[in-house]
């Protein structure tokens, strides 16, 4: 993809977005729809957009709606199911669906290029896990968001849903599964490019590839000055607002900003690998995303899943992820990334997390040294008939988990977190899952806290509501609103229950 040249001799912008992945793409899309007069620049170190964390093989492509991800509904100390996170994620994902429906109906993006509907299944074995899944099903179906969820402990029924997970399995095994037909597989790489292709038609939007951020600092007149490298030269740019959405590298850029809010953060890099199958006789038999339950005490990234994926018009099966450790913060990053992030204000927190999470470090090490045979043995827990010759190993993307300094020392946080400068002039996105699936909700919050929208916030709410078609459904109670929102999204996006 080509870059637009800088058109303003003074190199002044209303907003500069660092990184051309799904997060920056979503924010840029919202900005151009809500505030089309803004002069926006997106800079990307690589030659093409969406090729790091958003890359098709660098993530699972799951439209995270908490349909099947059991780690989103943990048990509390009293054995009660905690559902708040699942509800929040589901509602956030519906906002993403609403935006896509809005853009597709106005012919601004083509959803057929990046979105496929596919059932989301939770599958467990053993009495304890079956009991948990029953409890989860009963609790979740009390809510409108999950009323269409199905439960079965019938071996034959589960076989009809996902035959590969029961083939060669003992039919006397205690098993259970839930299914939500309205699941999705999403190619976030293609979605990112759809966004950028559309917004690049706006004369106020510029996108520059092979462009790297070297430094950024606040000037005396409260603007940001960014020093970048492009086309073999260094250029200084000025802007009122900066968004740092560069995946794992964001932590390094955030530290360069020297905002007080950045001083409590560090990053813990986690790599990943997939087992991939292209064998047609297998890919045609599996049409679902099947998530299992992680072992007690295991980190969230250890949740195993067997996914149907469509990438560049071809169907694949992916199993994993198998975690690992590297000092890189990006797949195409530097082995110095972790060391460059160590500062005097986060070093003790980083060391504290290392001491407290010795089990995690051991887990990552054990995952890193697994043989192909051992990885296939893991796969057989989900797919007993797996043949090693049908599967090959491929690197997934890098994730940098958040380390945050607290009164009790360093804390390792899984998930996504927004860091905002007090004056709203800079925002940074840290962390990982559910990330891309909830990008619309996350970027709406970024927009609300930014300095870009100086009018009454209620006007911003109205603009967002209009963009997401939610204004058409106002004055309805919560359940009716959600039901009609889903019906409208289903109709436009092509899901037929």
Curated annotation (Swiss-Prot):
InterPro entries: FAD/NAD-bd_sf, MQO. Coiled coil: none annotated. One of its GO terms (biological process) is tricarboxylic acid cycle. It catalyses: (S)-malate + a quinone = a quinol + oxaloacetate. It is an enzyme of class 1 (oxidoreductase). Disulfide bonds: none annotated. GO terms for molecular function: 2-hydroxyglutarate dehydrogenase activity; L-malate dehydrogenase (quinone) activity. Its cofactor is FAD. Its EC number is 1.1.5.4. The keyword Flavoprotein applies. Keywords: FAD, Flavoprotein, Oxidoreductase, Tricarboxylic acid cycle. HAMAP family: MQO. This is Probable malate:quinone oxidoreductase. It comes from Prochlorococcus marinus (strain MIT 9515). The gene is mqo.
